C-alpha cells in the first residue's frame, strides 16, 4: 500500500509527536491489540480505552484498520481489528452524496475500488489533495471500507465532526446555530454520541434552553445544542419527548394535500398528511425544519418541508361573567388552555350542555364562537335563575384550541390543533380510527386531551347523579335535533326544525356514547340559514335556547321577546355611562336581544328607577328603557330610607343631623369597617385565621383588598380576578380588566370614614412595628426552622443577623427566607406557619394588619406552589413576595 499520503513505517513504529491527520475517532469500552498488515498480533503493543486515534485506512478484505495512536514517546502507527463497537468516530455520516453515483478511489486517486449510491452517506476521516477520504458501509456491515472521493458532499465536516463539524460533547464556535426552540423539563438528559453511547461528564440540565437540530427516527436520538457555562456544546440525547418541551409545539400546519418531508439535500424522508400539525424547529435554505409525530409517538422524526404552513385565524375566546356559578377546570387542551365547565344549581338531576366541540362549523371562519357566546349566555342567565332540582354543567367551548387557532372546517379548527382529531368522532362507541381530515380520529378512542377530558367529566357527573341525566351537544348549522326526541322537542318548538333519527353511535359521536352510559342525549344543529353573528342575534337564538332549557328542567322561562326573567325592583339612583367606546344601547326590555330604542354615549348621566337582574331601568326621554349595569357607575344613591332608621343610626353613631345622601354614604362605609373588623378579629380570636382567610374565598378576598387600600395607603389592589382602585378618596371602585384592555366596573364601595365611628383598626399599617417586635418576629422564624428539623438551617440565626445589623435591607431578609424555604422544600409548612405566627406576634394590638398579612402569606403559598415548577422561578417569586410582605409589616 505504498503511497505519498500515509507514512511508510512498520506496525508499532513511531510517526512523530503528532498524527498525520487530526484524530477522527476514539477507542471506548475496551483496549485493542496492535497487529501487522496481515492481522498478526504485535506483542506488547495495545491501543488503550479512551485513546483518541486517527483512522487512516479500513481494509474491507481483512477487516482491519490502520490507525495512529498516542503513546508516552509519541504517536505510533499500526493495525487493529475493525471493532466498530469500540472505535467511535467523531463524524456522524456528515458526508452526503449528490443525485448521481460517486466513484471511490484508492490512494493513487485513479484506481476505482467502489461506488457510493445517490444520497448515500459516509463518515469523513480527513481531506487531502482536494479529495475527501471517507469510511462507508458495505455488505459486511457499517464502516467496513474506506477510500477517496472527489465530491465534497453536502456536509460541512472536515473530519472528526458531526453537524457543522462539531463532535458530540465539543464546543460550538460562535454559540447557538439557531435560536433556542425547546427546554429540558423534569429531569436531566445525558449526552451521547451518534450511536447512543454515553459521553462521560456531559449532561443537559433541567431548565436548559436548547436548540434541537435533528430528531433521528431509527435511533430516537435528538441532536441538540445546549448551554455549558460560558460556551455552547453539541451532542445527542435520548429523544425523551416527556422531557423535551418545544416552544412552538404543533405551530406548523399542513394544507389540504400531502407534504413531502425531505432531508437537507432533497432526499425523501417521509410525508405529512393533509392538515397534519408539526413543530417548527428552524428555517434553512428556504425550507422549514420540523419535527412531527410517527407511529413511535409524538415528535419522533424530523425533516424539511417546503410548504410555509397554513395561517391560523386568531380568535379571542369570550368568557362568561360569573357571579353565582362554580367554575370547574376538567382538563387542559393540547395547546395548554383550560377546559372549563360552569356549574349552576345543586339538584339531584344533571344536565351537561356542551358547546363548540367543533371550533369551526361550516358557514364562516371560526363560527363556533357563536356557540361559545350562547354557552356564556346560558351561564349568565341561569346563575341568577332557578334551576329547580337540577344541576347544570355548561361548557362554553370544548375545543378552545380549534376555535382560537384553527384555520379550516375540514381539519384543525373543526378538529383539535394538537392531533387534528374530530372530538365528535373520537368517543368509544362506534369508533373508527383515521378517516379523512374533516372527521379524523386517532388510532384509538379518546386520543386527544379534549375528548378524553370531556369523556371523563361527563362520566364523573353521571356517577354523582342520583336522578335524571341529560347531555346536549350544540352545533351549527344543519337545522335539526338528533338523538333523544324528548329533548329534541324542546328545541324544535323554539326553532321549528325537524327531528333526525339515530345517535351516531356507529361513528364515535359523543351523544351515542352518553346514551350508552344511561343519559338522555341529543345533538342540536342550529338553523342552516345562519350566515353571520347578526343572524344569531336577530334570530334570538340565545333566548330560544334559554326557553328550551328552562322548559326541559321544568322552570319558568325567560321572556319570549328576549328579555330578562327577572322583575323590576325599585331602586333610585343617578349614574354615569362608562367603558363605552362607541355607544350604549337603550333597550325596550331587560335583555340583550330586545329591541334598541336609543343610544347613550360615554359620560352621559342617567336617572335609574329600578333594577332588573343585570339591567337598570332608566328614564329615557318621555319613556323608559333598560341599560346593562356593567356600563353604569352609580354617582348618587337616591333610594328612600325610613326616617326612624335614619334618626336612630345618627344618634347611635353620634353623627348628628346629616342629609339622606350623607347618611347612605356613612352607612355603606360603616358596614365595610365593621365587617372587616368583626370578621377578621373573630377569626384571630378563634385561632382559625388560616382556615378563614382563604385566597379562593371571594368575600374575604374583597375584604382583604379593601383593607389593604384603606389602611396601607395603597392606590390599587388585586385579589382573585378583580381589581380595586382608590382613585377617589371617598370610595373604592371594583372592576375587571378584559384581555382587550377594556375595563368593566363592577361596584363602588364607600370608604369615607365617619368622624365619630370608633374602630380598633389603625389608620395605617406602615410604621406600626417597633424594633423589639421585629426582633421577636425573626426569633420566631428561627425557632420554627430549628423545631421542624435539626437538619434544616438557613446558615445563620436571622434574629442575630437582624440585631447585629447584618440584614441591611428588607430585600436581604426576603432573599434569606426564600432561599431557606426552597432549599429545604418546606414552602407549604412555612407559609402556613408564617400566616399564623404573624397573627400571634401582632395581635391583639394590630389584629387587622395581622389578618391581612396572614391572608397574603396564604395567597403567596397557593400561587407559588400551584403555578411554578422550576425552583429558581419559585424562589424568585417567593423572594419578591416576602419582600413585599416585610415592607408592608415593617
From Swiss-Prot:
Residues annotated to bind Zn(2+): 358, 361, 475
Molecular function, one GO term: metallocarboxypeptidase activity
SMART domains in the record: SH3b
Domain of life, source organism: Bacteria
Inducing or repressing factors: By UV irradiation.
Occurrences of domain Peptidase M14 (ranges): 303-549
Pfam family, one: SH3_3
Keywords from the named record: Antibiotic, Antimicrobial, Bacteriocin, Plasmid
BP GO annotations: defense response to bacterium; killing of cells of another organism; proteolysis
Keyword check for Acetylation: no
Essential cofactor(s): Zn(2+)
Domain annotation SH3b: ranges: 22-84, 179-241, 572-636
Region named Hydrophobic: 815-869
Active site: 525
Function field: May function as an ionophore.
PANTHER family noted in UniProt: FAMILY PROTEIN, PUTATIVE-RELATED (PTHR34408), GLYCOSYL HYDROLASE FAMILY 19 DOMAIN-CONTAINING PROTEIN HI_1415 (PTHR34408:SF1)
Name this polypeptide is given: Bacteriocin BCN5
Lineage: Bacteria, Bacillati, Bacillota, Clostridia, Eubacteriales
Gene transcribed to yield this protein: bcn
Amino acid at each position: 500500500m505504498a503511497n505519498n499520503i500515509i507514512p511508510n513505517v512498520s506496525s508499532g513504529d513511531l510517526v512523530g509527536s503528532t498524527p498525520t491527520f487530526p484524530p477522527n475517532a476514539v477507542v471506548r469500552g475496551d483496549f485493542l491489540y496492535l497487529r501487522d498488515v496481515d492481522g498478526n498480533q504485535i506483542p506488547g503493543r495495545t491501543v488503550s480505552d479512551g485513546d483518541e486515534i486517527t483512522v487512516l485506512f479500513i481494509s474491507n478484505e481483512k477487516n482491519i484498520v490502520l490507525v495512529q495512536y498516542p503513546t508516552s514517546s509519541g504517536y505510533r502507527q499500526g493495525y487493529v481489528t475493525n471493532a466498530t463497537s469500540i472505535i467511535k468516530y467523531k463524524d456522524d455520516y456528515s458526508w452526503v452524496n449528490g443525485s448521481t453515483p460517486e466513484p471511490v478511489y484508492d490512494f493513487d486517486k485513479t484506481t476505482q475500488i467502489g461506488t457510493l449510491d445517490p444520497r448515500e452517506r459516509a463518515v469523513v476521516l480527513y481531506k487531502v489533495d482536494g479529495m475527501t477520504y471517507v469510511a462507508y458501509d458495505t455488505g459486511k456491515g457499517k464502516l467496513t471500507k474506506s477510500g477517496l472521493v472527489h465530491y465534497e458532499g453536502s456536509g460541512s465536516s472536515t473530519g472528526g465532526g458531526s453537524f457543522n463539524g462539531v463532535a458530540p460533547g465539543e464546543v460550538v464556535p460562535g454559540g447557538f446555530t439557531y435560536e433556542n426552540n425547546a427546554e429540558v423539563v423534569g429531569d436531566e438528559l445525558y449526552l451521547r454520541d451518534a450511536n447512543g453511547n454515553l459521553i462521560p461528564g456531559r449532561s443537559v440540565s433541567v431548565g436548559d434552553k436548547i436548540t434541537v437540530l435533528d430528531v433521528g427516527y431509527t435511533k430516537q436520538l435528538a441532536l441538540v445544542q445546549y448551554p455549558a457555562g460560558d460556551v455552547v456544546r453539541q451532542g445527542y440525547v435520548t429523544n425523551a419527548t416527556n422531557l423535551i418541551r418545544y416552544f412552538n409545539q404543533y405551530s406548523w400546519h399542513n394544507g389540504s394535500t400531502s407534504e413531502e418531508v425531505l432531508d437537507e439535500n432533497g432526499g425523501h424522508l417521509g410525508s405529512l398528511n393533509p392538515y397534519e400539525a408539526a413543530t417548527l424547529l428552524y428555517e434553512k435554505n428556504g425550507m422549514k425544519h420540523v419535527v412531527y409525530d410517527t407511529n413511535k409517538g409524538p415528535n419522533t422524526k424530523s425533516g424539511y418541508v417546503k410548504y410555509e404552513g397554513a395561517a391560523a385565524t386568531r380568535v379571542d375566546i369570550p368568557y362568561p361573567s360569573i357571579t353565582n356559578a362554580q367554575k370547574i377546570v376538567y382538563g387542559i387542551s393540547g395547546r395548554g388552555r383550560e377546559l372549563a365547565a360552569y356549574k349552576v344549581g345543586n339538584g339531584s338531576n344533571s344536565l351537561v350542555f356542551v358547546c363548540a366541540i367543533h371550533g369551526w362549523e361550516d358557514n364562516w371562519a371560526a363560527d363556533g364562537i357563536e356557540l361559545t357566546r350562547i354557552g356564556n349566555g346560558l351561564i349568565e342567565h341561569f346563575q341568577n335563575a332557578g334551576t329547580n332540582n337540577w344541576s347544570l354543567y355548561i361548557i362554553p367551548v370544548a375545543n378552545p384550541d380549534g376555535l382560537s387557532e384553527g384555520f379550516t372546517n375540514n381539519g384543525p379548527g373543526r378538529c383539535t390543533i394538537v392531533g387534528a382529531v374530530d372530538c365528535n368522532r373520537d368517543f368509544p362507541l362506534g369508533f373508527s380510527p383515521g378517516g379523512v381530515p374533516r372527521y379524523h380520529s386517532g388510532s384509538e378512542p379518546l386520543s386527544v386531551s379534549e375528548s378524553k377530558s370531556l369523556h371523563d367529566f361527563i362520566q364523573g357527573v353521571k356517577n354523582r347523579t342520583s336522578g335524571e341525566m341529560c347531555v346536549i351537544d350544540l352545533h351549527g348549522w344543519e337545522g335539526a335535533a338528533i338523538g333523544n326526541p324528548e329533548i329534541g322537542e324542546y328545541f324544535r318548538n323554539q326553532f321549528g326544525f325537524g327531528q333526525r333519527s339515530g345517535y351516531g353511535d356507529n361513528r364515535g359521536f359523543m351523544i351515542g356514547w352518553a346514551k350508552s352510559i344511561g343519559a338522555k342525549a341529543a345533538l342540536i344543529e342550529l338553523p342552516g340559514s345562519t350566515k353571520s353573528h347578526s343572524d344569531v342575534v336577530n334570530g334570538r337564538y340565545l333566548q330560544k335556547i334559554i326557553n328550551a332549557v328552562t322548559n326541559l328542567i321544568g322552570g319558568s322561562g325567560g321572556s319570549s321577546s328576549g328579555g330578562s326573567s327577572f322583575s323590576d325592583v325599585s331602586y333610585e339612583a343617578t349614574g354615569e355611562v362608562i367603558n363605552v367606546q362607541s355607544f350604549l344601547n337603550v333597550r325596550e326590555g331587560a335583555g340583550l336581544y330586545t329591541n334598541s330604542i336609543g343610544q347613550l354615549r360615554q359620560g352621559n348621566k342617567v336617572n335609574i328607577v329600578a333594577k332588573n337582574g343585570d339591567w337598570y331601568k332608566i328614564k329615557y326621554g318621555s319613556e323608559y328603557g333598560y341599560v346593562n349595569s356593567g356600563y353604569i357607575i352609580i354617582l348618587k344613591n337616591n333610594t328612600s330610607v325610613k326616617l326612624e332608621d335614619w334618626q336612630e343610626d345618627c344618634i347611635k353613631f353620634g353623627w348628628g343631623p346629616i342629609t339622606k345622601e350623607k347618611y347612605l354614604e356613612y352607612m355603606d362605609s360603616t358596614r365595610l369597617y365593621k365587617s372587616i373588623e368583626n370578621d377578621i378579629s373573630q377569626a384571630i380570636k378563634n385561632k382559625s385565621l388560616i382556615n378563614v382567610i382563604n385566597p379562593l374565598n371571594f368575600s374575604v378576598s374583597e375584604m382583604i383588598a379593601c383593607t389593604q387600600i384603606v389602611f396601607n395607603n395603597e392606590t390599587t389592589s388585586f385579589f382573585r380576578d378583580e381589581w380595586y382602585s382608590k382613585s377617589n378618596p371617598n370610595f373604592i371602585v371594583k372592576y375587571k380588566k378584559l384581555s382587550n384592555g377594556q375595563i368593566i366596573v363592577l361596584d363602588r364601595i364607600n370608604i369615607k370614614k365617619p368622624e365619630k365611628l370608633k374602630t380598633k383598626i389603625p389608620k395605617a399599617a406602615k410604621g406600626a412595628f417597633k424594633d423589639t417586635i421585629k426582633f421577636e418576629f425573626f426569633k420566631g422564624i428561627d425557632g420554627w426552622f430549628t423545631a421542624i428539623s435539626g437538619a434544616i438551617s438557613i446558615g445563620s440565626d436571622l434574629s442575630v443577623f437582624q440585631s447585629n445589623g447584618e440584614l441591611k435591607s428588607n430585600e436581604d431578609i426576603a432573599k434569606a427566607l426564600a432561599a431557606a424555604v426552597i432549599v429545604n422544600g418546606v414552602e407549604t409548612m412555612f407559609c402556613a406557619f408564617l400566616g399564623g405566627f404573624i397573627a400571634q406576634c401582632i395581635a391583639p394590638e394590630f389584629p387587622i394588619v395581622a389578618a391581612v398579612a396572614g391572608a397574603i402569606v396564604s395567597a403567596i403559598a397557593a400561587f407559588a406552589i400551584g403555578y411554578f415548577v422550576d425552583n429558581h422561578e419559585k424562589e424568585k417569586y417567593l423572594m419578591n413576595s416576602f419582600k413585599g410582605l416585610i415592607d408592608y409589616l415593617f
